[in-house]
Amino acid sequence: MTLASAEKEMAGVLTFFQKETRGFKTGKAHPALVETVTIEVYGTTMRLSDIASISVSDMRQLLISPYDAGTVSAISKGILAANLNLQPIVEGATVRINVPEPTEEYRREVIKQLKRKSEEAKVAIRNIRRTFNDRLKKDDSLTEDAVKSLEKKIQELTDKFCKQIEELAKQKEAELATV
């Protein structure tokens, strides 16, 4: 494992964390709320983002325009089945979703989840660091000074990515608190 590959793995953890937290409902309409919902169409299951365009029509409303108008009812059923606390409204060949304002209890629960997810991401970053350091110590071709230097660099990377995760979590928490 090289320093560059460790950094790439850490960046992957950060990207995964960003994708996970994008789906948290903040009370604002965002395509990420429903794009991964699975829909039963054409005899198979597909993601909503693969069979329709999802746009924000205003701050609290999503507009879903299926590529095939015949899938409107399946989209509506899929959204209801996903248990997202969202009520789809079928209007001809489109589906509208009004995003409800989150309750205080819901916000507290999402903030708990956010903190847990951010801690899991930081643990994953630290595990990458530990794996890298273990491999360094087993590498007989490196001098003690080289090992110390690389350990310092991997620690700097770990600190950088953990800080980015904390900042993202704080932004999301602030977003939840201001709605």
Curated annotation (Swiss-Prot):
The lineage of its organism: Bacteria, Pseudomonadati, Chlamydiota, Chlamydiia, Chlamydiales. Its main location: cytoplasm. CDD domains: RRF. One of its GO terms (cellular component) is cytoplasm. GO terms for molecular function: ribosomal large subunit binding. Belongs to the RRF family. This is Ribosome-recycling factor. InterPro entries: Ribosome_recyc_fac, Ribosome_recyc_fac_dom, RRF_sf. Responsible for the release of ribosomes from messenger RNA at the termination of protein biosynthesis. May increase the efficiency of translation by recycling ribosomes from one round of translation to another. It comes from Chlamydia trachomatis serovar A (strain ATCC VR-571B / DSM 19440 / HAR-13). The gene is frr.
